[in-house]
Regions:
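C-terminal partner/receptor-binding element of secreted or periplasmic proteins
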Residues: 147-181
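Bacterial Sec-dependent N-terminal signal peptides
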Residues: 1-25
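Aromatic-patch recognition
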Residues: 29-157
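Residue-level detector of functional hotspots within protein domains
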Residues: 7, 26, 34, 160
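Extracellular interaction modules
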Residues: 6, 114, 140-141, 166-169
């Protein structure tokens, strides 16, 4: 009898656990602001694909018809944004969400070379390049953009300038500190 009750209890716990896990699922927001639930998976070569709830196949996520998508399992959020000096939109991964959002553009090319560019925007405004691993472009301009974004917090601005570290981690931590105030 005890074994029977334990089995029932175990099944009930497992059912409750799996029903909660299913409730947290991937989603895509299209250009009409409709939220579509489903499953998102990353291709080995290429980008992410989406299968709507009840659908049978995964399709490439169309950039011109999408605002953002979120992959629950990896907590990855991509938004469609037009980068400065570009005319067509790209998917940018949102690294930090708050008063200042931090986005990452990542492109891999042959020979294990990759480009990482971080952009920031304040209150969903214009994107500014704040950090990059490229040798092109002015580091001073990127720093100035970062300083302008946090200028309304003089204490943080002074601390950031004084630390004189402009690594990817330092930029991310500064934005997190700004957002926490």
């Amino acid at each position: 009898m005890k074994l029977y009750l334990r089995s029932i209890l175990c099944c009930a716990v497992l059912c409750a656990f799996f029903s909660q896990v299913k409730a947290q699922q991937d989603f895509l927001i299209n250009s009409k602001n409709d939220t579509l639930k489903g499953e998102i998976k990353k291709q080995f070569i290429g980008f992410y694909r989406f299968k709507p709830e009840g659908g049978t196949s995964f399709n490439k996520i169309p950039i011109r018809e999408t605002k953002e998508f979120y992959k629950v399992e990896k907590e990855i959020n991509y938004l469609v944004k037009v980068r400065p000096d570009k005319s067509s939109p790209d998917f940018l991964q949102r690294l930090v969400k708050g008063k200042i959002d931090l986005f990452e553009y990542y492109r891999q090319s042959g020979n294990n070379q990759y480009v990482v560019i971080w952009y920031a925007s304040k209150q969903n405004g214009q994107l500014f390049e704040v950090k990059s691993n490229q040798i092109f472009g002015s580091r001073k301009e990127r720093k100035d953009s970062m300083y302008n974004l946090i200028a309304d917090n003089p204490g943080l601005l002074e601390k950031f300038k004084k630390d004189d570290s402009y690594s990817f981690e330092a930029v991310k931590e500064c934005i997190k500190l700004y957002n926490s105030n």
